[in-house]
Amino acid sequence: MALQTGEPRTLAEKIWDDHIVVSGGGCAPDLIYIDLHLVHEVTSPQAFDGLRLAGRRVRRPELTLATEDHNVPTVDIDQPIADPVSRTQVETLRRNCAEFGIRLHSMGDIEQGIVHVVGPQLGLTQPGMTIVCGDSHTSTHGAFGALAMGIGTSEVEHVLATQTLPLRPFKTMAVNVDGRLPDGVSAKDIILALIAKIGTGGGQGHVIEYRGSAIESLSMEGRMTICNMSIEAGARAGMVAPDETTYAFLRGRPHAPTGAQWDTALVYWQRLRTDVGAVFDTEVYLDAASLSPFVTWGTNPGQGVPLAAAVPDPQLMTDDAERQAAEKALAYMDLRPGTAMREIAVDAVFVGSCTNGRIEDLRVVAEVLRGRKVADGVRMLIVPGSMRVRAQAEAEGLGEIFTDAGAQWRQAGCSMCLGMNPDQLASGERCAATSNRNFEGRQGAGGRTHLVSPAVAAATAVRGTLSSPADLN
């Protein structure tokens, strides 16, 4: 990334330049102003302690939003949290927000939910913003044409105290996805295919801009899914230039501009596009028409294949590190090379997370489950990304479809995306999940995770093996 030079700039460079408080001149980090700081219970306690020790207040509490998501249960939310560590973290967040004057959406609040679902649904996430959170998947907000990234606890304290962050410029990458997506192929399949192509380190040190006709055709929910998993390709952030789809999503939301302020904002937002002639450090191309439903077989998001394929054979891999990683992954996943992905049976299906816990995702799942039943021996959890999403799903009759099918329809939270709350796999259980990480033990010690789209998750729940909706016909 570069400072203003009069030369064509990428979208990321434009936002960066607009937020420089003090330039490092290329020798030191730039001091970047932060427009929105999102906070949750896991990465914030030490940051608030640091403020107390230094006798500081939160610099811009009105630009800070907190919500409870990682540790919260998704059933019996009116009861005390059973796990003492989780309970302490949630109670600590509540005390800290009360003391420092930060708005908090707690369990039972209609706006409570996963932080990366709540920000956009409230209209707080807007084009051209810099957004940070002590959470890897902050890149989700880049779907709105924002520069959004996860930060560590010490950086959380710095932003709370100063509303700025010292950062070194990133490299830029363009991921061009052109063509028409085949029926049954979703945003989740695009990002899983990309990570399989470039690897979990392919985007390291870069901000990815997703471009092309296939990206432009996606809803905001689809764009958020793709930007959410940018970090799984090693990228610092992911983004999509704002357009009419973006503006339509934002219009009328609680914190979106209105009246003359909307008109002024729109003028700025419409300038947020990569200039003709701007040069990216790296470019990658995907043919949308060639994509199909994707699923992971291993223990990182890059270890994925089309659902129609088979478990790969490590002995056919020429790279030693790749082969050794594959052998280790297959041993953990208890899979044999050559096994058709569609033959792999699951014990559980999880629909939710900041990747795929929005209303559009739930509609897709409901369409597959309508008039069908979850297979015997399969436990299916459907967890909305926020209580607002849950209320909308209930209003549309989706909750009844889920429960009629035999799925568990839960309250909002991060749930089975990660083993920090009661929703976990038992050791040896296998799960098809719409979340973003399939690391060893991610969903519970010894649990085995296959990352899939909402459509594949729903079809898998019905058949009991990894499947797409086409397999149900």
From Swiss-Prot:
Pathway in which this enzyme or protein is active: Amino-acid biosynthesis; L-leucine biosynthesis; L-leucine from 3-methyl-2-oxobutanoate: step 2/4
Disulfide bonds: none
GO biological process: L-leucine biosynthetic process
Database matches in Gene3D superfamilies: Aconitase, domain 3
Cofactor note: Binds 1 [4Fe-4S] cluster per subunit.
InterPro entries: 3-IsopropMal_deHydase_lsu (IPR004430), Acnase/IPM_dHydase_lsu_aba_1/3 (IPR015931), Acoase/IPM_deHydtase_lsu_aba (IPR001030), Aconitase_4Fe-4S_BS (IPR018136), Aconitase_4Fe-4S_dom (IPR036008), IPM_dehydratase_rel_enz (IPR050067), IPMI_cat (IPR033941)
Family annotation (PROSITE patterns): ACONITASE_1, ACONITASE_2
Top EC class, one word: lyase
Induction context: Induced in response to the thiol oxidant diamide.
Family classification: Belongs to the aconitase/IPM isomerase family. LeuC type 1 subfamily.
Summary of the function given for this chain in its UniProt record: Catalyzes the isomerization between 2-isopropylmalate and 3-isopropylmalate, via the formation of 2-isopropylmaleate.
Protein name as catalogued: 3-isopropylmalate dehydratase large subunit
Native organism: Mycobacterium bovis (strain ATCC BAA-935 / AF2122/97)
Lineage: Bacteria, Bacillati, Actinomycetota, Actinomycetes, Mycobacteriales
